Amino acid sequence: MKINAMSLFSSAGIGELDLHKGNLNFVVANELLKKRADTYQFFYPETKMFQGDISDEKLKREILLSAQQNNVKFLLATPPCQGLSSVGKNKHQDHFIKDNRNFLIFEVFEFIDVLNLDFILIENVPRFIEMYFPYNGQLLLLEEILKIKYASKYQIDIVILNAKDYGICQSRPRAIIKMYKYGITWKLPTIQAEISLQRAIGHLPPLEPGEVSSIKWHSAPNVKPSIIEAIRHTKPGTSAISNPIFYPKKDNGERIKGFHNTYKRMEWDKPAPARTTYSGSISSHNNIHPGRLQLDGTYSDPRVLSLLETFIVSSIDENIEFPPGSSETYIRTIIGEAIPPKLLSAICFPDGENINVK
């Protein structure tokens, strides 16, 4: 049986790529940014997209009306990670608290309050569930607020799940909040063995920076020669920052300083580190291909993962298409913003079973 669903703070819809294949029928979506909303529509032309600020009362009423007319029973939301990291005396804290626009999770509450939903899924970065939000004159954790508001109607499960435990070659922890009516069964997915980078992308041919291969999406951005030299002398799992001789340099020859995980290669026997919105930057955290030892003692592939490799470790179909004009930077950004599709699918459809109200 099809269940009508809606997606709030949908971004470009990357996380939903496997959801629309199940029995969830996404009829309504909302995204603030036009380019991302247009990309969502490219992927899901049958879903009605309401582009704009969800805190705008007129737009919110339109979204709610559409959801009611379509008898939406499933809500997916990824609100921005906004809140207070601690409860203390901060001269800016009172001003921050008084502006509800700083707490967009409250917009999600309005939809839960109005719609007779069977399932609610809120996902975000792990620190989201450690933040404090103003509620009834107090600063409370999200779990505390949810239990006050909804424990009488919904079972509330809050967990941290890591993509690497669910058949995805990427260590990507996410905070998962599931709310579902009492009497409904919605179990957690079964943990699977980790997938190494060797198994996931080891079959792909090496690439030099700036090289465009004949394989779709398998090309490498260019890199400054001095950086290439430093990375060639960097072993898997280590950072070029700590190399004694061949290290990243500025144009004037001065040594570049950075954290231990910048200019760092991945490791073949582990899943990829989390793919962020900066996955195309060779200097950003844990972004460099593991490389293979060469006869001269250096290592191949002094580059970031290609888009194809990024798709693979993010559980995205290798033959995916994007709207015309989508730049590599944009594609990497929207992937970095999203939960890996296979993880979201595993949560919604545990063990491959359709979600059901029985």
From Swiss-Prot:
Enzyme class: transferase
UniProt keyword annotations, A-Z: DNA-binding, Methyltransferase, Restriction system, S-adenosyl-L-methionine, Transferase
Domain of life from the UniProt record: Bacteria
Active site: 81
Keyword Transferase annotated: yes
MF (Gene Ontology): DNA (cytosine-5-)-methyltransferase activity; DNA binding
Hydrolase in keyword set: no
Reactions accelerated catalytically: a 2'-deoxycytidine in DNA + S-adenosyl-L-methionine = a 5-methyl-2'-deoxycytidine in DNA + S-adenosyl-L-homocysteine + H(+)
Pfam families, per the entry: DNA_methylase (PF00145)
Note: The HgaI modification system consists of two cytosine methylase genes responsible for modification of different strands in the target DNA.
Family: Belongs to the class I-like SAM-binding methyltransferase superfamily. C5-methyltransferase family.
Protein's name in the database: Type II methyltransferase M2.HgaI
Species this protein is from: Avibacterium volantium
Encoding gene per record: hgaIBM
